[in-house]
Design a protein with these regions (language model features):
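Short, surface-exposed, charged loop/turn segments at secondary-structure junctions
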Residues: 113-118, 155-170, 212-217
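Active-site core of metal-dependent hydrolases
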Residues: 148-149, 179-180, 210
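Structural recognition of alpha->loop->beta junctions
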Residues: 161-186
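C-terminal functional module detector
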Residues: 1-7, 19, 25-28, 43-46, ...
Length: 271
């Protein structure tokens, strides 16, 4: 019945070996699918600036084994790979896979850095243009934009700051469709204080990142309905996906406490 669709467990920020992820696209889909928990994931590998110094250093450090981003001439093959694997994911796991990309601007001055996800991307978008031009191109393609980790992180202090979109929110908020309120282990409460539409995602690069903040939303398991739900941002919630403890039917604990923790547990009578 419309309006009473089940909540979907979603991760809209996932990287594979097409950029700097640890797993192949196929293995990534199998990892999510075999949990039996996930309904929707978006593959969002990096599109880098031509002179990305961090990626250049990374390629040297990995002896060229990792490219860290998708080149323009590789992009059609990237979308074809996602399309092929998305059919298998839906058939084998009833998992909806959305094609995306993270248009990544890493500059020497942290205040100029912006990472923008395009969900349901159709064509390559260059990172060598202004953030507002990137956002406008995402709109032209009919894709959905997500501002990635838009504020200072409290946990991963060694990673670069990507605050450009937030610092210029008065000018850009009309072009940004959704903001990350949580990214892996970090919460960005500032986005909710402004009442911006929000999501929570893992920024997945390796298997342990599976256990992190995720999005719950109420919609049919089809991209047009999910897009509409994300933009409306009414039946949307954040959930922390933990190993062996997430229950889609409620909040009941299904894991186990260690004996030491049981010894410290004190139950109070209901008032």
């Amino acid at each position: 019945m419309p309006g009473y669709e089940p909540f979907l467990l979603c991760d809209f920020h996932v990287h594979t070996r097409w950029s700097d992820g640890r797993l192949t696209l196929r293995d990534t889909i199998d990892l999510y699918g075999r949990t039996g928990k996930f309904d929707v994931i978006a593959i969002t590998d990096h599109i880098l600036m031509k002179r990305d110094l961090l990626a250049r250093a990374g390629r040297v450090a990995t002896l060229g084994r990792c490219t860290f981003g998708i080149a323009e001439d590789q992009f059609p093959a990237y979308l074809e790979d996602i399309a092929r694997e998305s059919e298998r994911a839906r058939r084998q796991y009833d998992l909806l896979v959305v094609p995306g990309a993270e248009i990544t601007q890493n500059k020497l001055r942290g205040k100029k850095n912006a990472h923008i996800i395009a969900l349901d991307i159709k064509r390559y978008i260059s990172a060598d243009q202004s953030p507002d031009d990137i956002l406008k191109e995402i709109r032209r393609q009919g894709a959905l934009s997500v501002a990635c980790h838009p504020h200072h992180r409290a946990v991963r202090r060694l990673e670069i700051s990507t605050c450009y979109l937030w610092d210029h929110r008065s000018a850009l908020s009309g072009l940004v469709d959704v903001w990350e309120a949580a990214n892996r282990d970090d919460l960005f409460s500032v986005t909710s204080l402004k009442h911006f539409p929000y999501v929570a995602s893992s920024d997945f690069h390796k298997p342990k990142h599976l256990y992190s903040w995720k999005t719950l939303l109420r919609a049919e398991k089809e991209w047009p309905a999910i897009r509409k739900a994300l933009c409306a941002n009414v039946d949307v919630a954040l959930t922390l996906f933990r190993k062996d403890s997430w229950n889609p039917n409620g909040t009941a604990w299904t894991g186990a406490l260690r004996p030491a923790a049981l010894g410290r547990l004190r139950l109070r009578p209901a008032r």
